[in-house]
Amino acid sequence: MKFNQFSYIPVSPETAYQELRSLGFEVSLDASAKANFESFVRKYFLFFEDTDLALKNWIADPETDLLSFFQSDRPLTAEVFGLVALQLLGFVPNVDFTDSVAFLEKMAFPIAFDGSLNNLHQLLATRTQSGNTLIDQLVAQDLIPISNDYVFFNGKSLATFDTNQLHREVVYVETPVDTDKDGLLDLVKVTILRPNVDFPVPAMMTASPYQQGTNEPSSDKLTHKMEGDLLVKPAGKISLSRPEIKAPEADLTPINPVTKAEERFAHTDTYTLNDYMLARGVASIYVSGVGTFNSEGFMTSGDYQQVLAYKAVIDWLNGRARAFTSRSRQHTITADWASGKVTTTGLSYLGTMSNALATTGVDGLEMVIAEAGISSWYDYYRENGLLVSPGGYPGEDLDTLTEFTYSRALLAGEYLRHQKDYEAYLNELSTDIDRKHGDYNQFWHDRNYVQFADRVKATVVFTHGSQDWNVKPINVYQMFRALPKSLEKHLFFHNGAHVYMNAWQSIDFRESMNALICQKLLGLDNGYTLPTVIWQNNQSEQTWEVLDNFGHDNGKHIQLGKSEASIANHYEEEIFAKYGKAYQSFKDDLFMDKANAITLDFELDQDIQINGRVHLELRVKSSTNRGLISAQVLEMGDKKYLAPIPAPKRMSLDNGRLFKEEALRELPFKQAKYRVITKGHLNLQNRKDLLSIENVTPNEWMTIGLDLQPTIYKLNKGDKLRLVLYTTDFEHTIRDNSDYEVTVDLSQSKMTLPY
């Protein structure tokens, strides 16, 4: 374990004293460091009447138990403090460590001992081996009572709300859209978990089309075949118009108003970051949206109709939209329990809706936590004029996702009433996505949130993984860079895949969100400042660093070679079939120079930290009137790399007081032969830009530029890079087995590493 503490807020000795005393620690500004430490440690043993016995079972140094130390006249030293602090944090001498000084240094222990109360204050805010901070562990053990009111420590809310006596209610919010065109504004189901209190509370809202269930069997039937010809597209320019996202004014006329919801629920799937804050006084709201189980409308999949329907829930929390107690629309109900302040949460589609909601500039949305979210749907399903499936899902497209999330059809009565109209709508959508050509068009433009980044007012927190080939890093990169310069924004850029990071051992992400939520939603003047970019170092285990930005302008140029080389697109049928059935076998062969590719190896002559988009400038020609080029950059070398999927450790992370416990996780640091750094794909007809389609003349040289997926990746002098240039990618692109070649003039081609 390593400590990476970004949530602690430095305080004055007076504040440290006041907060420690308020929690029942009998410390004094006049007492010695040793006396205060003894009082602190004795308080830790909440379940012991005889704390002497507990102290006797701990040690102050290899020769002295802790009780004997406190009874002696020896002063408290950094060594004793450190050894006892380790035991307080759950580490066991002679098991987890033998040399406490070396162990503390290896773990980057964040507290510099000076004997002050600030040391004890920071120790409470430090994570234990279980993943909980020491103060959260003690509160879960009833250090302070459940009060159903806010208690803050170090600018963060503690788990003082009763999660056994929550309000669990359902309302149906009236949206400003009629997506199924039945003449009625669509209602969306809102599932609410909130503390049982008599004062207004803020809310964490998760907009998830998956929340009420999915229609996987129907979606699987629509999965597209990836085998086919790369078509020649007519040359020309693509024209677009700016989407209109203005909603009509809401009708706020009450109808037989009531103050109590009539629908309850026993269980719903939740996000543990929401659970963590629910125990700390923030309501948790889940909204599936239009076209989902027990909501109305059709699934419009990423357009601003879908977004405005989610926005209506935030409007309802602020008195600007109506909600009904049931879909019969007989009684309206107001959110009289809500303060109106909201943060959105969730990963993938959920993070996508966070991005989209932020661009509406809706009042009340104070903060957005967008985890691995899409910022432009074209960049999820397409790339540079090509069909490019999200990693791990070849053959998926927006029509299959629409079918997957249209859970309204799981209700047989709804299926009976609406399926015919829905299928007509889905057929139209399937045409609009244009799988034939892979070009950007108005359909995709209507689902590009980046163009409205200037409307964002909320504080934005992003998380994204360098190994996320599902929602690829271009999505966070372009949104992060497009936001107004005056806006407060933050990015946690880790080395995982498409994964949550709130339960990781190495970083206090949820505590950082607690501090920020208290500041933005509860109005707590805690002085908390979160760095702009927090990056997980790819060369070390559990190591995080602060960076100034994502994307740098400096570039190191690497000439690709001195000759020409060719890529054969065609495979023998047996190999082509094998790769199509198991794309991982293609990747294995590709990276080991066993597939159709140009493989180029380079040894770095300097240390470099890639930060941004690796750029390829290639001089190429195709033997036919079409073609595509794919590229991947890898670090080669048999050594330890961070694996992309977090491994569970133990079921030790508590989100309240024995509430919604979950497994602690971390990216394993494992031996491997290589690590993919970045990748990219380009249709040669889109070599100029995304909106320009040009002819490809057979055997005529072209200069193309290809920006690969953005990343942050550290390399040392002597490290070996491998650039692989190829055509068909069996995981991502159309599988065209035509017999043509792409030739690259390596002497006129280069790779630029941004740093």
UniProtKB/Swiss-Prot annotation:
Gene Ontology CC annotations of this record: cytoplasm
Location in or out of the cell: Cytoplasm
Predominant location: cytoplasm
Gene Ontology biological process terms, A to Z: proteolysis
Gene3D superfamilies named in the record: 1.10.246.70, alpha/beta hydrolase, Galactose-binding domain-like
Matches recorded under Pfam families: Peptidase_S15 (PF02129), PepX_C (PF08530), PepX_N (PF09168)
InterPro entries per the UniProt record, alphabetical: AB_hydrolase_fold, Galactose-bd-like_sf, Pept_S15_Xpro, PepX_N_dom, PepX_N_dom_sf, Xaa-Pro-like_dom, Xaa-Pro_dipept_C
Highest taxon of the lineage: Bacteria
A GO molecular function held by the record: dipeptidyl-peptidase activity
EC number: 3.4.14.11
Active site: S348 (charge relay system), D468 (charge relay system), H498 (charge relay system)
Catalytic activity field: Hydrolyzes Xaa-Pro-|- bonds to release unblocked, N-terminal dipeptides from substrates including Ala-Pro-|-p-nitroanilide and (sequentially) Tyr-Pro-|-Phe-Pro-|-Gly-Pro-|-Ile
Quaternary data: Homodimer.
HAMAP family in UniProt: Aminopeptidase_S15 (MF_00698)
Record family assignment: Belongs to the peptidase S15 family.
Purpose of the protein: Removes N-terminal dipeptides sequentially from polypeptides having unsubstituted N-termini provided that the penultimate residue is proline.
Protein name per the record: Xaa-Pro dipeptidyl-peptidase
Gene it is expressed from: pepX
